[in-house]
Amino acid sequence: MKNDKTDFTQGRILPKLAFFMLPILGALVLQAAYGAVDLLVVGRFGSTSGLSAVSTGSQVLNLVTFVVTQLAMGVTVLIARYLGEKRPQYIGQVIGGAAIVFTLLAAALFVVLVFFARLISSLMQAPAEALDLTASYVRICGSGIFFIVAYNMLSALFRGLGDSRSQLIFVLVACIVNVIGDLVLVAGFHLDAAGAAIATVAAQAVSVICAIAMLLKKELPFKIHRSDFKLNPQCKKFLGIGLPLALQEFLTQLSFLALCAFVNRLGLEASSGYGVACKIVNFAMLIPSSLMQSMASFVSQNVGAGNKKRAEQSMFTGIGIGLVFGCAVFALVWCKGDVLSGLFTADAAVIANSYAYLMGFAPETIATAILFSMVGYFNGNDKTLWVMVQGLVQTLLVRLPMAYIMSIQPNASLTMIGLSAPTSTAVGILLNISFFLWLKRYENQTSA
């Protein structure tokens, strides 16, 4: 098939899954790092309004990025499936079709983010003193959306091939570019939020160039032809997998934007504190996120090869890995959340608001170890419609209503608002366990 390192259908599960997951985790750490650097540098060398602008603007960009990532999951799963089935001849068509689809998507996002940046910022309830800076941040990042979309498509391609190391390399280069850009433009030229946005776009551009260069040099188990670059039958297949995930992620991120708007109404200090907390949350969620991404490729290969029992075992292995690290992260966030917040700003009020939110959010670091591993399993098993349904239940029936109710209370508590996340995740775990047991029963009955 491929070399043994990218063949997940044989060998011990724990080391195979761990070694595949580690570079993905490293890449996610670096992505979170250069997002955090924006906030850290603006917090230290910019204004409080700039800090709020980066906080609110990055929420908008997170929505776009996460939705594109989930849509690209269809590419990852389909490539891994064809490798598991030993039908690599279809992969060129998958890549060519994906290039066309994601280019069209990037063009649409460019129009929305560049020409409607101020409207989006207003809908986000950006504080009046930070509105112009927020719109500028969104507009500049929107101008580089082609790089953001291309990066996520290329990352999905590498993961589908069982190669998680290449992604780590080109993200490392991007992180270095972003740090240098932030220091020069924000600390040096005092461009505040706009400088952070320019640095982010430049970093994404460099990462795409590196990814393309690495892909061209890589020895691939298939050929890509010019005729593959069109809307072909493979587009329907990967969109069938990715669209439910993208819709679910869109509504989930929309709920976090609504949450951001709820918090913004509580004032500039609450808005800035929430922004700092979100950067810490991004780091706290890295291990569950890397498990989910690696699980999809791992499971998809085994399902393609007919190894369903091994696919199930990989899910339980992932849950075990996640729980070990999740408990450690929980303890750190719960006990030292104020210290972590202090890394981003010296403003005592902002630190207090950030820590208040983290106290409510902290149990999420444990709960997602279970949820994300199960979601990764269902993604790889082509049960993305279910993933969408359970995600919508969490978002629309639990997280959003609870966060809104807590935000309109007299002397609204950021801790109680933060608690809406682990509460909705707990509901998601119960739903996924029920579906997993039902699915096993159904498969046993149909195979009997």
How would you name each of these model-derived features?
Residues I24, L28, L40, V77, ...:
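Transmembrane alpha-helix boundary and packing residues in multipass membrane permease domains
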Residues M1-M21, I79-F146, G188-L243, V299-E364, ...:
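Short alpha-helical transmembrane segments in multi-pass integral membrane proteins
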